[in-house]
Amino acid sequence: MENVKSKTEKSVVAITRGGRWEAKKVIKKGLDLIGGINSVVKKGDMVLLKPNLGYPEAPGMPPWTCTTDAMVLAALTELCFEAGAKKVRTGDMPAHHVRASYMLASTGVQQAVEKVGGEVVCLDEEPFITREVPGGILLKRQALPKPILDADVIINVPKVKPTRVGKWTLGFKNLFGLVPHEERMERHRVPEHFYVLTDLYKIVKPALTVMDGFVIQEGLGPRMGDPIDFGVVIMGKDPVATEAVTVLAIGHEPYEQMVLPIAEKQDLGTMDLKKIEIRGESLESVRRYTKVSPGDLWLNMSPNVVEYFGGACWGCGFWIQYTPYPWEIDKNKKYALIVGNRPRLPDKFTEDEIIVMGTCATRSRSQILKACPEGMTPRFIGGCPPYWQRAHGYYEYHKIDQMPRAPKANFTDM
């Protein structure tokens, strides 16, 4: 699907306002501003809506504060049918091996889309088929759920909220939910992660991005952020322009969304406002500052933990705050946490316990052992990133361990 261009050859992005209870009206208005739903969906098309159902809502909060609103997905389903779509399906694969069927049901998405004639598809239960990535830089071949490859039209429907890897989980980040669980953690290293996202776009090729900004998050996203009644939907066919305008609308600059300069360099769209035509509401009328997630917080908040750093990437950076976990800390002890390549070490450790995390730090094993007091044995946590070694505690900490688990991916060579 080509980006909508005006006579001045600008990418077109629509901004519309309203309440989530009038989602269809607000979304239709935006669609009409960029060429109408018929410019995206044709008669007989099989459409797949890709929401963000990555995380369950925070305790005590309604689902639409954390995941793509069921009302948005129901509205898009109806509009696609009105354009002549043969079938409209909604599907995702949540984060951290949570089962898709659980999230589709618990968020109300399944009930909402089925009520208007749509279907849900549990992408984690579908066969994964490997395809070449056209123009792939990091990904040359990628396995994707079969319904993605079967769809005539894919509409990307992210939730506007901050995340810990990058800044905001918007259009490009939302495509990461199509990667098999078995491949996700090794692709969370920065900046590698952003090249994965742009390569995913090249094979998935969403025809349209619709940002659900009715209720957004700020702060401790992607799950525990504070909800804000924003009442805005932003959409467009240029994924870079649509994401750039969204970042501006929530009070920040496009270059802060680290995937965008990479995507623009690869000619996936533009983040230059001079090359973007905004229709509907003005950017100034909706713009408000929102807090980002503390993803760059490279420390453990416990006063009992002393960090010794070398050159580390975000693959280990995320796990610093969780190593050790609060329940692993004895308040009467001090812990040395060593992370990164060629870490700066003391002549002798004075802490009671020593934790060495990640493949890079493990390479300094001999120097670390030399700095240990006699009789002390460090605890080595390997991995790049060390996800699998720390994941169980993370699941327990966020109560994810109590949720149904996704099946192993069924990789099919078709």
Feature-to-residue mapping (PLM):
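N-terminal and secondary-structure boundary signal
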Residues: 1-414
